[in-house]
């Protein structure tokens, strides 16, 4: 195993701690760059969604993972970004301008949400962000002169340097990938700056942070604004990818999906946002695959274990009927959330770290390394 | 004026349902500092249980009602055992996520079992109306109001006058200290979940004649019950009901007097206003942390 010998703070905050990182991330980048020429168009489309979800995931990580402010209202920020883009595009504003404008506006609204949120903690903050999202959703449905109400808005393809970029083509994918990579690098830099350290300090203990001279209010508002702005950028891409937006796309359901992204990925590292996004976006094609192919496979297994043709066909039709039940996807979602919270609280990235550590320490790995400590906190009401 | 009273009564009836769901939130919150996002879905499930007993198996209304309450109390214990107990003592956010997951699961599974249609339970008070002058009050709405008042009173007495209630309050203040004092915290939490599921079932059954039972009813009403619980101060039993009634009245008044669209938003606007001006709610306790 490799020991990193650090002699000063600069060593500690390097983006690439050792040369191995260049190799692995270089390889990853190469794979991502050739992906559009290899994968099917459906998978490419899913990959674009992975980029968008991961961008939102990173935004949410800044707020929830690193500043400790839970939010169940990020669908509203996404909606604001998407609608700003659609509205400005209608008046012939070029893409780079409305892209930035959407982020700026969403960031501003995020800051405005952040101010009232200063007084709120824990569950109250969650409820307040839910209410904010509801109000935004209703405004989008009612403000018909701008948002076209429930009929929704169409949004034309991105035009970069006078060339229209198809939403299914590789160029759009590269655009989303670029936004994601820039977001991740920007966030990494943010997190190793004084601002990022203040965020983490606020997450770990607000009282302690304040007594160390951190302006808690300022940094909370900053965190909200930055998180919202990034979500706004993602919203522009989201709108372009779907080419049609309407208020009912930006419901609580979507906010919960974003939370699931970071919960499943892991809330303590930016890797989590990407892994979680892959999981959430890819679960759809996976379930479709299960629905289509699983009955046949199970019938095949039944047949090999000596079941007659009649019985195998019977099994196949039963499984098919079960797989096409209406709410199955929701049930699987629910089970996945509960299982992750119960058994893998550090998320997929935590699992990856555990596996890595297992091989690094091979015979000496012990499970207690990652054991969560129970804190039977005193009442939050006395906080 | 007559319109106003009519709106007021239907607002109060609706508000009582919110209040009953909010009661469930408050009970669980009081005992464990956990916010149960699946509370609305427990209500929905209770309604479906009652529908199964009464509508499908043809039992007497009261027998079916009691059966549904008992079944749901057991189910509440089960849900607590499986989903909440293993993560008790961990950050609140993970528990919230777990209950959101539970809610998803319950919604989908009940959609699979009972289908996605609207169901109606025939109750003894479905038909009758009470006439006071030219005011017409439906019995089903009055039944909701009466049941809420009774339940609220019973629960308040339970929490403040019985030993078990005191144990629950103690474990909510400080779980570890309560444990040291000989309170079986795990069993207490389990009982709280049973009670809150039972209360949710009452809400579901009483609600059935008013809004019907379908698999999404819990989500819709559960989210409306949040403003109620916050308005009353998360953690106060009378507060939950008062908050629920206020939210119900605000909603029905906004639907009647304000432009279209306000009806759905008004509770949340009120909620945000309350959070900004008086985050501890109307009946809440607020103590600053002393270092």
Segments (PLM) and residue ranges:
Chain B
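Transmembrane helix-bundle core of multi-pass membrane transporters
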Residues: 86-161, 188, 253, 258, ...
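Transmembrane alpha-helical segments in multi-pass inner-membrane proteins
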Residues: 18, 22, 58-70, 190-271
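Single transmembrane alpha-helix segments in multi-pass membrane proteins
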Residues: 4-56, 82-90, 94, 231-237
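Hydrophobic core segments of alpha-helical transmembrane domains in multi-pass membrane transport
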Residues: 47-52, 69-75, 102-108, 147-156, ...
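Residues that define the loop-to-transmembrane-helix transition and helix capping
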Residues: 38, 62-63, 93-94, 163, ...
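Alpha-helical transmembrane segments within multi-pass membrane transporters and channels
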Residues: 58-102, 109, 242-247, 278-279
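Helix-loop-helix "hairpin" substructures at the membrane interface of multi-pass membrane proteins
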Residues: 14, 136-214, 237-243
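Alpha-helical transmembrane segments of polytopic integral membrane proteins
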Residues: 22-31, 50, 75-76, 80-81, ...
């Amino acid at each position: 195993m490799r020991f990193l010998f650090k002699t000063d703070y600069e060593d500690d905050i390097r983006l690439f701690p050792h040369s191995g990182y260049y190799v692995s991330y270089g390889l990853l980048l190469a794979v991502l760059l050739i992906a559009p020429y290899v994968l099917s168009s459906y998978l490419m489309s899913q990959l674009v969604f992975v980029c968008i979800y991961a961008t939102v995931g990173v935004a949410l990580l800044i707020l929830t993972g690193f500043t400790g402010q839970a939010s169940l209202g990020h669908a509203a920020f996404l909606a604001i970004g998407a609608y700003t883009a659609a509205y400005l595009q209608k008046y012939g504003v070029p893409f780079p301008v409305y892209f930035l404008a959407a982020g700026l506006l969403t960031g501003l609204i995020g800051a405005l949400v952040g101010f009232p949120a200063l007084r709120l903690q824990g569950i109250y903050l969650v409820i307040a962000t839910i209410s904010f999202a509801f109000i935004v959703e209703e405004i989008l449905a009612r403000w018909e002169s701008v948002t076209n109400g429930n009929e929704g808005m169409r949004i034309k393809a991105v035009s970069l340097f006078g060339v229209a970029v198809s939403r299914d083509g590789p160029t759009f994918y590269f655009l989303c990938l670029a936004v994601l990579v820039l977001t991740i690098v920007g966030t990494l830099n943010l997190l190793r700056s004084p601002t990022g350290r203040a965020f983490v300090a606020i997450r770990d203990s607000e009282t302690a942070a304040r007594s160390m001279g951190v302006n808690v209010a300022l940094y909370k508002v900053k965190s909200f604004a930055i998180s919202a702005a990034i979500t706004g950028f993602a919203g522009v891409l989201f709108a372009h990818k779907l080419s049609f937006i309407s208020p009912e796309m930006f419901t609580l359901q979507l906010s919960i999906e974003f939370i699931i992204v970071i919960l499943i990925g892991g809330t303590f590292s930016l890797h989590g946002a990407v892994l979680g996004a892959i999981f959430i976006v890819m679960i759809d094609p996976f379930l479709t695959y299960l629905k289509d192919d699983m009955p046949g496979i199970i019938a095949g297994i039944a047949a090999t274990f000596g079941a007659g043709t009649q019985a195998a066909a019977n099994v196949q039709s039963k499984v098919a009927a079960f797989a096409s039940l209406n709410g199955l996807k929701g049930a699987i979602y629910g089970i996945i959330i509960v299982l992750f919270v119960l058994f893998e609280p550090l998320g997929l990235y935590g699992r990856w770290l555990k596996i890595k550590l297992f091989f690094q320490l091979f015979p000496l790995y012990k499970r207690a390394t990652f054991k969560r400590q129970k804190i039977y906190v005193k009442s939050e009401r006395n906080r | 004026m007559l319109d106003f009273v009519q709106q007021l009564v239907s607002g109060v009836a609706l508000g009582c349902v919110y209040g009953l769901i909010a009661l469930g939130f408050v009970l669980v919150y009081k005992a464990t500092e956990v916010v149960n996002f699946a509370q609305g879905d427990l209500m929905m499930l209770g309604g479906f249980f009652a529908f199964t007993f009464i509508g499908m198996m043809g039992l007497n209304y009261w027998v079916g009602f009691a059966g549904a309450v008992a079944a749901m109390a057991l189910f509440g214990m089960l849900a607590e055992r499986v989903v909440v107990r293993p993560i008790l003592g961990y950050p609140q956010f993970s528990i919230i996520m777990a209950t959101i997951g539970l809610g998803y699961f319950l919604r989908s599974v009940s959609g699979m079992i009972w289908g996605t249609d609207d169901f109606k339970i025939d109750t003894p008070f479905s038909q009758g109306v009470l006439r006071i002058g030219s005011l017409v009050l439906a019995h089903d709405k009055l039944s909701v109001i009466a049941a809420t008042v009774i339940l609220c009173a019973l629960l308040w007495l339970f929490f403040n006058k019985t030993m078990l209630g005191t144990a629950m309050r103690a474990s909510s203040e400080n779980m570890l200290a309560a444990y040291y004092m000989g309170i079986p915290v795990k069993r207490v939490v389990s009982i709280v979940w049973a009670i809150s599921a039972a209360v949710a079932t009452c809400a579901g059954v009483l609600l059935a004649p008013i809004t019907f039972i379908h698999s999404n009813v819990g989500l819709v009403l559960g989210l409306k019950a949040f403003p109620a619980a916050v308005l009353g101060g998360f953690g106060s039993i009378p507060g939950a009901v008062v908050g629920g009634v206020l939210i119900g009245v605000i909603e029905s008044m906004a639907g009647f007097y304000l432009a279209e669209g306000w009806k759905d938003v008004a509770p949340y606007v009120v909620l945000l206003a309350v959070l900004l001006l008086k985050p501890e709610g109307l009946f809440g306790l607020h103590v600053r942390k002393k270092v």
